[in-house]
UniProtKB/Swiss-Prot annotation:
Substrate binds at E158, R159, K281, R318, R335, K359, E386, E510, W540. Keywords: Carbohydrate metabolism, Glycosidase, Hydrolase, Polysaccharide degradation, Xylan degradation. Changing E158N: Strong decrease in the glucosiduronase activity. This is Xylan alpha-(1->2)-glucuronosidase. Optimum pH is 5.5-6. It retains about 40% of its activity at pH 4.5 and 7.5. It catalyses: Hydrolysis of (1->2)-alpha-D-(4-O-methyl)glucuronosyl links in the main chain of hardwood xylans. PANTHER family: ALPHA-GLUCURONIDASE A. SUPFAM superfamilies: (Trans)glycosidases, beta-N-acetylhexosaminidase-like domain. The record marks W150, W540 as: Participates in a stacking interactions with the sugar rings of 4-O-MeGlcA. Changing E392C: Loss of glucosiduronase activity. Its EC number is 3.2.1.131. Beta-D-glucuronate binds at N201. It comes from Geobacillus stearothermophilus (Bacillus stearothermophilus). Alpha-glucuronidase involved in the hydrolysis of xylan, a major structural heterogeneous polysaccharide found in plant biomass representing the second most abundant polysaccharide in the biosphere, after cellulose. It catalyzes the cleavage of alpha-1,2-glycosidic bond of the 4-O-methyl-D-glucuronic acid side chain of xylan and releases 4-O-methylglucuronic acid from xylan.
């Protein structure tokens, strides 16, 4: 940790199995900034893992063991690889040991492809794989693989649990260029190609990021990310024409407003020629937007898209739009329905450089909620998915909660938008409806902490997000194994133990928190710790409706809010009926008596008791398994993780006792096993 922070999974520890393999040359004829970064990374990895310093050459030595780096623009690679690579970021890795010297070829369709290919090769070395017979063709499934930062310019991070911003402090840029470079390396190593650096809730100072005052600083950050194949985006304030433009309105149909945004876009691209575009949170949670002027979201987004289009820029328009002034007495209004109701009628009305960014579920990154019905419901409108890597509702990086299994369930969910086989992953990779732009974004979990993510094991969520964004068909087991070996080494006990901990942790967290998909039950505002009625009588639309007889939200067509009708018929029917609704989502879709029997055979109330007692024991098991690794993990990381796991056990007990006591007092029904409940 020589730089004051960890290298995470790019540790490049020595690998004795390669001690006899001596690469003498790196053949690299290209000199672009990306290529220079590629060569530097390869040299760093070979130096650390194999203790060799191959020369970088442009002219080939026919007798030398070598690694060849190139693109399809290079004459010698164009013909043999013709038609192999379709995606501009794709690459080939091949070994050649047939005639004489040992060669590795890492060939990309573009420089970015070579970058990803080199990181893949270094991953193989870190994993201790046999590199003698490589024949790999890789192409990303998703075009846009993005990280969203919720960093504020005062240095704080909204929903951040890993220190302060690495970009901003005291309303200025930090100028931590080496750390930003190392962050870019981490992101590029898992295939991330886009980043927005400021919070979607754009405050007064951040509104000025699109002005001459801050654009030189934005350009400096963009230069660093560009070197690693990452485009820079900014979150913008929809009211900017008023707040910094001196106009009396931000009406998207006003000619002066449109002119102002066109001039602003032109200015940005003078500083950053490959600027990615804007991320927009509008008409949501008190943020300004087109509704103020009687316009819809298509009119609002298209105005920005028109300004960016001449430069190839994108508008990423968030669909997190709902009534945050709901009357809790009103049982007909349903926050879960809002995104679909707002956006579905606008299908086909958005410009082609607009992408709708849709949260994985209809509510707000809960430990369990159904997949948003908006996925697949707009065949004429670009869509991408938003997940939350930062653990706002899943333990805030004090608790271990590996989110890859959750995201896998979402990606593999069949929408039935074009019949069976219409999974969410096919919607967001653009293949189902031939979207021009699509992809996936994750809200970052990093900050200035030495381990980047607060909880060392939370690094696995950032790593896993990138790997899933590149290839949604990777399994959670594969991703966990890759991360553990690269981060902690290949000792079999270490790999087996930490992989088990990761893969078990989401269900464990779910067990001791809110039951059966009902969500929330957290302290208002900061969202940490149990408070069953914390939001029950608020204006946020996040209710569980527990009374003396039962619990849950009736979202059926027959007797409830009608939310189930937003799904395609196969899923609508599944969720509408108690007979087919999955247990884990029962209380999201139905209000049932505490004595209702789940498909598991347990009653709802007994399930609540059982899972909360079991969850605490499972949290203890996480800590116990980690303690068995003492001496196999360096002291710093061992104690850091142990401290977090101890916190998790204590907080799991609090969750257990609050939830079980609350529902005992509501229902008056005893735990059939007579365990301790505070009456």
């Amino acid at each position: 940790m020589t730089a004051g922070y960890e290298p995470c999974w790019l540790r490049y520890e020595r690998k004795d199995q390669y001690s006899r393999l001596r690469f003498e040359e790196i053949v690299a004829k290209r000199t672009s900034p990306i290529f220079q970064a590629v060569v530097e990374e390869l040299q760093k990895g070979l130096r650390s893992m194999m203790e060799i310093e191959p020369q970088v050459v442009q002219e080939v030595n026919e007798t030398a063991n070598s690694i060849w780096l190139g693109t399809l623009e290079d004459e010698e690679f164009e013909r043999p690889l013709e038609g192999t690579l379709v995606h501009p970021e794709g690459y080939v890795i091949r070994s050649d040991v047939d005639d004489g010297p040992f060669r590795i070829y890492i060939i990309g369709k573009t420089d970015a492809g070579v970058l990803y290919g080199v990181f893949h090769f270094l991953r193989l070395l870190q994993m201790g794989e046999n590199i003698a017979q490589l024949s790999i063709i890789e192409q990303p499934k998703n075009r846009l693989r993005m990280i969203n930062h919720w960093d504020n310019m005062d240095g704080s991070i909204e929903r951040g649990y890993a220190g302060r911003s690495i970009f901003f402090v005291d309303d200025q840029f930090v100028k931590q260029n080496q750390r930003i470079k190392d962050y870019a390396r981490l992101l590029a190593s898992v295939g991330i190609n886009a980043i927005s650096i400021n919070n979607v809730n754009v405050h007064k100072t951040e509104t000025k990021l699109i002005t001459d005052h801050f654009l030189p600083d934005v350009a400096e950050v963009a230069d660093i990310f560009r070197t690693y194949g990452i485009k820079t985006f900014l979150s913008i304030n929809y009211a900017s024409p008023i707040e910094i433009g001196g106009l009396p309105t931000a009406d998207p149909l006003d000619p002066e407003v449109r002119r102002w945004w066109k001039e602003t876009a032109k200015r940005i691209y003078q500083y950053i020629p490959d600027f990615g575009g804007f991320v927009v949170k509008a008409d949501s949670e008190f943020r300004p937007g087109p509704f103020t002027y009687g316009r819809d979201h298509a009119e609002g987004a298209n105005m920005l898209a028109e300004a960016l289009a001449p430069f190839g820029g994108l508008v990423i328009w968030r669909c997190f739009v709902y009534n945050c002034q709901q009357d809790w007495r009103d049982r007909t209004t349903d926050r879960a329905k809002a995104a679909y109701d707002h956006f579905k009628p606008l299908d086909g009305q958005f410009r082609e450089n607009v992408i709708l960014q849709i949260k994985n579920g209809p509510m707000d990154f809960q430990v369990r909620e159904p997949v948003s019905p908006l996925f697949g419901a707009m065949p004429k409108t670009n869509q991408m998915m938003e997940v939350q890597i930062t653990q706002e509702y899943t333990g805030q990086q004090k608790h271990l909660c590996f989110l890859i299994p959750q995201w896998k369930e979402v990606l593999d969910f069949d929408t039935y938008a074009k019949g069976k086989g219409s999974e969410v992953k096919k919607v967001i990779d653009g293949s189902l409806f031939d979207y021009r732009y699509s992809g996936i974004a994750g809200v970052s979990n990093i900050g200035s902490d030495p381990n980047w993510t607060g909880h060392t094991l939370a690094q696995a969520n950032l790593y896993g997000f990138g790997r899933l964004a590149w290839n949604p068909d990777l399994s959670a087991e594969e991703i966990a194994n890759e991360w553990v070996v690269q981060t902690f080494g290949d000792d079999s006990q270490v790999v087996e133990t930490i992989s088990w901990m990761l893969l078990s942790s989401w269900r464990i967290y779910e067990n001791y928190t809110s039951p059966l998909g009902v969500g929330w039950m957290v302290n208002p505002g900061h969202h940490y710790g149990p408070n069953v009625d914390g939001y029950e009588y608020s204006h946020w639309g996040t209710y569980h409706y527990a009374d003396r007889d039962g619990i849950g939200v009736d979202r059926t067509v027959a007797t409830g809010t009608g939310y189930t009708a937003q799904y395609f018929p196969e899923n609508a029917a599944m969720y509408e009926s108690l007979d087919t609704c999955p247990d884990e989502l029962l209380l999201f879709f139905h209000h049932v008596p505490y004595t209702h029997r789940l498909h598991s055979g347990e009653t709802v109330i007994q399930h609540i008791y059982n899972t909360h007692f079991e969850g605490v024991e499972q949290a203890k098991q996480l800590r116990k398994r980690w303690e068995q690794l003492k001496g196999k993990i360096d002291e710093k990381r061992y104690h850091d993780v142990l401290e977090r796991l101890t916190i998790q056990v204590e907080h799991a007990k609090e969750w257990r006792d609050v939830i079980n006591t609350y529902f005992y007092r509501k229902s008056g029904i005893d735990d059939q096993y007579g365990r301790k409940i505070y009456r």
